[in-house]
Design a protein with these regions (language model features):
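Intrinsically disordered, low-complexity terminal regulatory regions
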Residues: 1-68, 75-149
């Protein structure tokens, strides 16, 4: 089988193997995505109660930011984690954001993770993005498209 070139689709395919088997993957089963080359574009969010106190456990080098307001890519993904947990489904989102002060277009996937296979305790995120070209109009920040998985 040809290797999937897009990180988001590779991570989604790996996650779906577990979900199609009737359970969410455990953290140790997704750790390979948080290491190595792919890990630079991945993050892991710990879900805690109250949900507003959820926080990053791992943020890949390419997604790291000093402050996580919702107009940054990492902050935007963090703000979506509670919806993923309550829906008990993954979500793919596309839109515009700021990464290290630059405008980008992105495609991200947020996927529930459960240590016991049932109770969601983390959300795995993976993101592909590109800088806006100078000849492209500046886009508003936020989500342009959402697809529940």
């Amino acid at each position: 089988m040809e290797e999937e070139r897009r990180l988001v689709w590779r991570v989604l395919r790996h996650w779906k193997k577990f979900v199609d088997g009737g359970r969410f993957p455990r953290r140790d089963e997704i750790d390979p995505w948080l290491r190595g080359e792919d890990g630079k574009n991945c993050l892991l969010i710990a879900l805690v109660s109250p949900i507003e106190l959820s926080h990053f456990v791992v943020v890949g080098l390419n997604l790291a930011v000093a402050l996580c307001s919702t107009d940054t890519l990492a902050g935007l993904l963090l703000s979506r984690a509670p919806r993923v947990a309550s829906a008990r489904r993954g979500v793919m989102i596309e839109g515009g954001a700021t990464l290290r002060g630059a405008d980008i277009l992105y495609r991200s996937v947020l996927l529930p993770i459960a240590e016991d296979g049932v109770t969601i305790d983390h959300v795995l995120g993976a993101t592909n993005y590109r800088l806006l070209r100078e000849d492209e109009p500046r886009l508003r920040q936020g989500v342009f498209q959402t697809q529940w998985i």
